């Protein structure tokens, strides 16, 4: 898929929102990628996850994991495309954990997926969990990279689409100065 085809798909799915948003990282932005909308229709989710799975098809992935809630369906679909186990991590008492009988065996090759990467906070938490379990992180994958390729996880990071969307520290946000109400659309549950 070309970047322009992906942009058209994101527009059609009404994923890109404009306004004044509080991101899960605590930063503010004038644009928000509501990637959950991708997963309400297989017309969008299947080809985007297939695009990402294709980038890792030769890496002998054994497990695909994503943080709840945003990457549960994504981990499933990428895992399905790769023909491997898929699980998700949940935050419990402020820390990412494996529950529901999910496991990562020592030495298993793991792909971590996330719908949107802005600061990489949730991804880094899942990376720590995978390391604690003894898994080998082969790479990170996202549908949207909001950093425009600027983030470094220390392992290969590939996205279906990359877009540099500006975000601001709250005390430096020009949108706050206009008085436009702040909207918190995310679901990470971190204060």
Q: How would you label these PLM feature ranges?
A:
Residues 59-68:
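Short glycine-rich phosphate-binding loop at a beta-alpha junction
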Residues 104-141:
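A contiguous pocket-lining binding segment that forms or flanks enzyme active sites
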Residues 54, 76, 80, 128, ...:
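Short, well-ordered alpha-helices that flank and scaffold nucleotide-derived cofactor binding pockets
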Residues 60, 105-107, 153, 169:
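Residue-level preference for short coil/turn positions at secondary-structure junctions
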Residues 64-65, 87, 138, 158:
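Structural detector of well-ordered beta-strand residues that form the stable sheet scaffold
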Residues 3-9, 127-191:
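PRPP-dependent phosphoribosyltransferase catalytic core
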């Amino acid at each position: 898929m070309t970047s322009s085809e992906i942009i058209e798909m994101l527009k059609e799915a009404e994923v890109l929102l404009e306004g004044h948003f509080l991101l899960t990282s605590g930063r503010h932005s004038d644009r928000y990628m509501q990637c959950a909308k991708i997963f309400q229709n297989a017309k969008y989710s299947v080809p985007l996850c297939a695009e990402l799975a294709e980038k890792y098809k030769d890496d002998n992935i054994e497990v695909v994991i994503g943080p709840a809630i945003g990457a549960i369906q994504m981990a499933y679909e990428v895992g399905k495309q790769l023909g491997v186990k898929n699980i998700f991590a949940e935050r419990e008492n402020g820390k990412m954990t494996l529950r529901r009988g999910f496991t990562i065996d020592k030495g298993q090759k793991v792909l971590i997926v996330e719908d949107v990467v802005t600061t990489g906070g949730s991804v880094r938490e899942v990376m720590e969990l995978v390391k604690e379990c003894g898994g080998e992180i082969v790479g990170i994958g996202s549908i949207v990279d909001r950093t425009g390729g600027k983030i470094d996880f220390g392992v290969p990071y590939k996205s279906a689409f990359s877009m540099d969307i500006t975000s601001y520290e709250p005390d430096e946000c020009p949108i706050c100065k206009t008085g436009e109400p702040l909207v918190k659309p995310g679901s990470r549950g971190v204060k």
